[in-house]
Amino acid sequence: MRPKLGKTRKKNKYPAKKVSATVKHDDFYISENNRLTYSYKLDVKNKIAEVTCVSLDIKIQDEWMTIVYYDSYHEGQLHRHPRISYFDPSDAPTMFGVKRKGSQNKLLRWAIKDIENNWLVYKQGFIKRSNISNNNTDIPEIELY
């Protein structure tokens, strides 16, 4: 009598390749002193796996400064990080008013559209929080548009 043998798996002759996520990046100018920058990760099926960053950058004395950005790093949920002020580079993450449901592709499109539609509001808020006025010589003048 022959002993029963359990099913054995064939060893794969060609093991699966380790594929790292592809990062895509692009930016476009809203105006001469304001730009929108975004980057995202694609999975092996070329679908958006993560919104890495969608940011609004402003030019101050020939240097670009990010004043607000979105990412979906924490638990895949999109959230906004507004910069505190010109002197305080820390940010205050919030999900207030941010789209919460949808694919990463939809969240990316929403974040881009939000900055396109509200960039002036974000910039005015940054200027106000920075207490920028024409009398303050410590802060360079910031073009509104």
Give residue ranges: language-model regions.
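A short, terminal or domain-edge coil/loop segment
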Residues: 2-6, 19-20, 77-83, 121-132
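Intrinsically disordered, low-complexity terminal tails and linkers in eukaryotic proteins, enriched
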Residues: 142-145
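Acidic, low-complexity intrinsically disordered segments
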Residues: 91-140
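Negatively charged, low-complexity tracts enriched in Asp/Glu with abundant Ser/Thr
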Residues: 1-61
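A short, structured beta-strand/loop element
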Residues: 48, 52-93
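Intrinsically disordered, low-complexity segments enriched in small/polar residues
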Residues: 4, 24-25, 74, 86-90, ...
